[in-house]
Amino acid sequence: MPSPHTTYTCQGTHIGHTRRVNEDALFVNEAEGLWLVADGIGGHGNGDKASAAVVEHVESYCQRNSVDDSLADITSRLRQAHQTCRNMAGAGMPGTTVAALIIFQSKAILIWAGDSRIYRLRGGELTLLTEDHNLAQERYRRGELSREGAQRLKSANVLTRAVGVHQDLHLDADVTEVEAGDRFLVCTDGLYKELPLEKIQSMLGASFSEHILTALIEEALQRGGKDNITGIVIDVR
């Protein structure tokens, strides 16, 4: 059954002002309804190998016959990428975050590990659809910290889940409704950590064009650009 929605996409990545290597990666297959970012976190400059492994394993993804089958397929591919990273001998144990959005008919399938994020703009209101996997967020969930306190902690950067890092890969997933007029942002932390939520919301609310993501990246660069910056904007009609 074909999707009742049409999507339009713009995407981009930038090395930022301080990194020597862009360890971010992105993948877009609009025909199959898949959008993904990965933020390499490996030591010794090997994070780019991990994020590239994720892209390599999802490149041949084809939409399945149901939400469950689509979720199972992308999960399997990410587990294969996880094993590829684990098998990289002498590569400094490279790892990567991942955040993927699949639009299947009238559903949005979200799957992620780490602190790359998926936002949705609907009716002018921006909502974060994913939850970061880091030590600070764990303490916030346990009630030990306020959200503001968690964001200030250095442990906000210490990931508890990622592709390739731990023995087992633990992914979070969610399924939500898609409506015409929705706009999604899939991005790495180099984008959202530089921009206040209100700024992301206002910039995403502009008329859709290929320049929306470019403008977000330029704004992040002007505010510091301390990390690699990668994002994808998906407009649903």
Predicted segments — roles?
Residues 1-237:
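PP2C/PPM-type serine/threonine phosphatase catalytic domain
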